[in-house]
A protein has these predicted regions:
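Flexible loop/turn connectors
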Residues: 31, 105-207
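Alpha-helical recognition/docking segments in bacterial nutrient-uptake
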Residues: 1-44, 48, 107-108, 112
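Conserved small/polar residues in nucleotide/adenosyl-binding loops
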Residues: 205-215
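Conserved H-loop
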Residues: 52, 83-84, 138, 213
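Short acidic/polar active-site loop segments enriched in Thr and Asp
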Residues: 52-53, 115
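Hinge/beta->alpha junction and helix N-cap segments in small-molecule ligand-binding domains
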Residues: 4, 30-41, 57-78, 82-104, ...
Length: 216
């Protein structure tokens, strides 16, 4: 959702809890993933593993959660003394098919590449990965990628994708509990709740099964 989409919420008098979306209206509660922290941790992991400047597979479509992940990426660079201007950034559509087409076009233009990337979501990561593989790059031997969201597709691609896990059940449970609390309470105060995301690495068993794979 974008800012204009929220306007119809402004004058509603019923309890409102948004899930994984931020809105600054005083009558709206939000339960969100800590996107900034998840992206920060993923980027720091890439920096420490690859001892270099990670690239960024950034969504070409503006979404608030992606902008928070963008801030986490650049904050990790600054924290580790790396210049933001030297990171390779590719703007890709936030779908597997769109990211694949966009990345393939960039590769055909001989666009400079990084040795590792953080991606705004798993769809972008997987689409880019397929484009790299189409052009003969080995994943992760030549290029490593960490996605975000831990979508089911991340474990079915070869090689499997390391990603940031979003605890969807906990997210929904927290939102439902907050909504019930608002309904039953006599007084109201707006809250914005953030839930931590965690890193999910490719398992050792999977590494043994696929010789091209190495742990990020």
């Amino acid at each position: 959702m974008q800012k204009p989409d929220f306007m119809y919420l402004k004058n509603l008098t019923v309890p409102i809890v948004l899930l994984d979306t931020y809105c600054d209206f005083p009558n709206v509660d939000c339960v969100m993933i800590n996107n900034m922290q998840g992206a920060f941790n993923a980027t720091v992991r890439l920096i420490h593993k690859h001892i270099g400047q990670p690239g960024y597979l950034h969504s070409s479509y503006p979404i608030h959660s992606f902008e928070e992940r963008c801030e986490g990426f650049y904050r990790a660079l600054r924290k580790n003394g790396l210049p933001s201007s030297k990171s390779v950034v590719h703007l890709l559509s936030p779908s597997v098919e769109g990211a694949y087409a966009d990345m393939l076009e960039l590769l055909e233009q001989n666009t400079p590449l990084a040795s590792c990337y953080f991606a705004d979501n798993d769809n972008i990561a997987i689409g880019a990965m397929k484009a790299f593989q189409h052009k003969g790059y080995k994943i992760p031997a030549d290029i490593s990628i960490i996605g975000f969201d831990n979508m089911p597709l991340s474990t079915s691609v070869i090689p499997a994708l390391s990603t940031i896990h979003v605890p969807k059940q906990n997210l929904g449970k927290t939102a439902a509990e907050r909504l019930i609390n608002v309904i039953e309470s006599d007084e109201y105060y707006s809250v914005k709740i953030e839930i931590s995301a965690t890193y999910i690495a490719v398992s050792y068993t999977h590494l043994r099964a696929h010789e091209t794979l190495r742990h990020l």
